[in-house]
Amino acid sequence: MSDSPTSSPPAPSADSAPPPDTSSDGSAAPPPTDSAPPPSPPADSSPPPALPSLPPAVFSPPPTVSSPPPPPLDSSPPPPPDLTPPPSSPPPPDAPPPIPIVFPPPIDSPPPESTNSPPPPEVFEPPPPPADEDESPPAPPPPEQLPPPASSPQGGPKKPKKHHPGPATSPPAPSAPATSPPAPPNAPPRNSSHALPPKSTAAGGPLTSPSRGVPSSGNSVPPPANSGGGYQGKTMAGFAIAGFAVIALMAVVFLVRRKKKRNIDAYSDSQYLPPSNFSIKSDGFLYGQNPTKGYSGPGGYNSQQQSNSGNSFGSQRGGGGYTRSGSAPDSAVMGSGQTHFTYEELTDITEGFSKHNILGEGGFGCVYKGKLNDGKLVAVKQLKVGSGQGDREFKAEVEIISRVHHRHLVSLVGYCIADSERLLIYEYVPNQTLEHHLHGKGRPVLEWARRVRIAIGSAKGLAYLHEDCHPKIIHRDIKSANILLDDEFEAQVADFGLAKLNDSTQTHVSTRVMGTFGYLAPEYAQSGKLTDRSDVFSFGVVLLELITGRKPVDQYQPLGEESLVEWARPLLHKAIETGDFSELVDRRLEKHYVENEVFRMIETAAACVRHSGPKRPRMVQVVRALDSEGDMGDISNGNKVGQSSAYDSGQYNNDTMKFRKMAFGFDDSSDSGMYSGDYSVQDSRKGSNGASSEFTRNETENRNFNNRRY
């Protein structure tokens, strides 16, 4: 053995030495390698002879990584064959114990051939010997590590035993040069551990890891742990990928179902969708919002004093067929729940459209009372086939009302399209209409406090349509018959079948007359030009009804007093100038009213019924005037009483007749309005008792009115 070391020094010059040496030892390597002192190394070297070619290539980088120890690197590879290169390398640090140290290096030599991880430790061990000399005491632990490696390789216990007799001096060696012993202890575990990992072929990995942390012998232990954890890591990665795939599949299924559900709930026909330029601004009177917030429209009003009229208009009540949930959408398509009904469903809801369920009848058709499966009461409006209102008004209601949600506007629940049938389903308002309570036969006198509340509520609903909807919505048929009341006499403006979207780029909308005579603004009767100020005029007529208790047109009044506006105009001027309104106020009230409120309503009505449209106030100003306790603001728009152009009743009548012919092509008018409760066309035709009679056809009133004027 000593001769082989002497001949080995020349070998370090080139890495070619290992192959020849392995060939020389090949006689003992296949089986006899166990007899040689470094039996375990040859055993390890025999399997990887094909690998040495790769390790050198991979092994070359480490030298570059650690420039100081490259020479030892070259010396370390040759040792595997002859075991002598180590003796030459250890002498520099410690000359006396070179021979005993020779045997430990052989143990280090096999690792480089198997996985090339041990060579780095040897490379870095030469530099630390001085520091390691002080660490001579810790030498004993290495021997303790030797038994575990022997136990770790199941087939290698015999090899260590044969190896120990040869290098019997190895125990003393660790005591003297601490540098060499640490390497041998590290090497055996590597040999034992590398016997398993070679299958994983992690040659590149161990090389880099020991090169970075070679000084500590503990670095050799992690590689085996990593080799064992590699399988676990792959298993965990597989589970993670599978779990991710399952979650992704579930998400796709959920999205597909959600999309299908949306498609089912969507409108079946795009023509019923609101225009793209239609938007709604929320205000303090919407569902679930704070009623004390100021009005959000231009020239907004403050509603903090709503309670002065006897009730808070910001309160939310859910009785009487109303759904005022705080979660109701601000500008959603008919809120939540079912929106599309089949004709069969509506037939069941209305009990086959039974006559005893009829709430009223107008020019468009009948209104039936119905009950949904959840017990909610609804009003089903059925359009007459071929009626003048027809599909245009139906589409308008579906497009507009479905987007409008305000506590003073009747909400649309759903709709039905079946062949030629067109039906709308509204929330049911149980307490009839303002017309019913003001002019109904045998009805008790409507209290003044309730009249004020109704005026303010309906004004807020109209102001919302004019100010907070863009483009603004013009009702076009404001009248007492279209103001519904709930059990607490909260006003709900209804009948949007006549509403039109008024584009902000247009100053008016020309269309056929559908409003009720007596509420028509002068400019509307003259030319058919429609603006939001036309609604203001009609609302002024409603205020006059509340003040006086009279109908807008009453053929049983004395000659020249049939028209409410014509009769009230001089009295309004007198009341504003003198403060005496005794001739205007409904005598049935018997002076049970608040004078300030009466005077404020008179001023507001006078401003609303001005002959000149531009000189009328906006609805937002009307609300502020009616709902203010002190200063009512400039409701006059800078105009004093009498400054507006004079109201010519004769010209108004001529304009009305002319426009009626232009709109309908004949001197007749159709039924108008939505009626409920005790009122029907048959009852109205009986009307012969002045204020106690109910009129629903304006044809008779206007024909008689015009005949008496001319």
UniProtKB/Swiss-Prot annotation:
Residues 1-235 are extracellular. GO terms for cellular component: plasma membrane. Residues 7-21, 29-130, 137-151, 168-188 have a biased composition (Pro residues). CDD domains: STKc_IRAK. The modification Phosphotyrosine is found at Y426, Y524. Residues 257-710 are cytoplasmic. Residues 209-220, 301-315 have a biased composition (Low complexity). It is a single-pass membrane protein. ATP binds at L359, G360, E361, G362, G363, F364, G365, C366, V367, K381. Residues 353-619 form the Protein kinase domain. The modification Phosphothreonine is found at T342, T511, T516. SMART domains: S_TKc. Residues 1-229, 289-334, 676-710 are annotated as: Disordered. Keywords: ATP-binding, Cell membrane, Glycoprotein, Kinase, Membrane, Nucleotide-binding, Phosphoprotein, Serine/threonine-protein kinase, Transferase, Transmembrane, Transmembrane helix. InterPro entries: Kinase-like_dom_sf, PERK1-13-like, Prot_kinase_dom, Protein_kinase_ATP_BS, Ser-Thr/Tyr_kinase_cat_dom, Ser/Thr_kinase_AS. It catalyses: L-seryl-[protein] + ATP = O-phospho-L-seryl-[protein] + ADP + H(+); L-threonyl-[protein] + ATP = O-phospho-L-threonyl-[protein] + ADP + H(+). The chain crosses the membrane at residues 236-256. Pfam families: PK_Tyr_Ser-Thr. Belongs to the protein kinase superfamily. Ser/Thr protein kinase family. Interacts with KIPK1 and KIPK2 (via its cytosolic domain). This is Proline-rich receptor-like protein kinase PERK13. It comes from Arabidopsis thaliana.
